[in-house]
Amino acid sequence: DCTGCGVCVDQCTVNKGGKLAPALTWSTLEAERAAGENENEKFFNDVLPDNVMGSNTITTVKGAMLRKPLFEFSGACAGCGETPYVKLMAQLFGENVMIANATGCSSIYGGTFPTIPYTKDKNGRGPAWANSLFEDNAEFGFGMRMAVDANRALLKQEVETILASDKAPADLKDALNGAMSHWDNSKTPEAVEAQNKAKAAIAKALEGCGCEHLKKVSELSDYFCDKSVWIVGGDGWAYDIGYGGIDHVLAQGKNVNILVLDTEVYSNTGGQASKSTPTAAVAKFAAGGKKTYKKNMGFMSMSYGYVYVASVAMGADRNQTMKAFLEAEAYNGPSIIFAYAPCIAHGID
């Protein structure tokens, strides 16, 4: 989706009468609505499928971009370097993702009424998002992981009780066994199909049964598929104010993913220096150039020996960025991605 950076308007040209002229021009929202863009928007949302991947796979840049983004049209600054990472995360994992968002830029463009950018697919599934305080977001996301694990454990226990019962219908047992066979690999297309069959069988069985175990399974049926927990925030949160929480969460070894949107300054409050700011960089509170080194949080995280650590810059290498996100999601343990993001606070014209 467009980030409003304006590069296409500045750089894309066409030959008009032997002279190069802009191929695109800026237009106001009111003018585009008057020209019929509302109808076009209905076509894109209501008629087109959620993904048009064809033979492309989600593990490629091209394939992933042919999926519906479940984060779109944010109110971030023009050309924001953070939003492409959030959009990629929602595009890859959005149907099952739970996001704990630290206060900062990403909480402003991510959850400020009325421009809430998180959306859902045609099945009504999309990211679950919540914003905590600046100083406890890592712990907040860790709590989400613990809650998911507890709900999945309870669901498994209730399903096993039903499967052990002589009174449960055979078709219900077959459907539940099918869903449980994908318990440890629950996000594949085959697993999702089995889970949907189980949900349908549960709903059918409930029509003629008041079994408390079955009611509980129905309440928890969304947890047949494990949730993807992402803890998101900026470098001011990760390197400074919330670092203690991140360190504690990484040390627990649980399956959480941390995305650090690293602009190397406190972007939301005007571009002040953080511990992520490189040596000699000029920023607010470091007008003469920052005298100390950038905190090497990646090495600090690697010292645990069981944390997946990646450093990415989408503008430098899209394939490596994709690979890092997919590997972090696939790793059954704590992962942290440091995502370099250009920012308007850098003052680059």
Segments from the language model and where they lie:
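Iron-sulfur cluster-binding cysteine motifs and their immediate structural context
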Residues: D1-E32, N56, T60, P84, ...
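Beta-sheet entry/capping signal
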Residues: V9-Q11, A21-L24, E95-A100, C105-I108, ...
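Glycine-rich ThDP/TPP pyrophosphate-binding loop and its adjacent helix/strand module
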Residues: C225-I231, D240-N255, L261-D349
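Structured alpha-helical segments in the cores of large, soluble enzyme domains
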Residues: C12, L48-K62, C209-Y223, V265-S267, ...
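N-terminal amphipathic, basic-rich helices that act as targeting or association modules
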Residues: C12, G63-L66, F71-T103, S107-P114
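N-terminal leader/propeptide and maturation segments of large enzyme subunits in energy/redox metabolism
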Residues: F134-E212
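Acidic, Ser/Thr-rich peripheral helices and adjacent loops at domain boundaries
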Residues: E37-N56, P117-A128, A273-K295
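Ferredoxin-like iron-sulfur electron-transfer modules
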Residues: D1-G4, L24-A34, V61-S74, V217-S218, ...
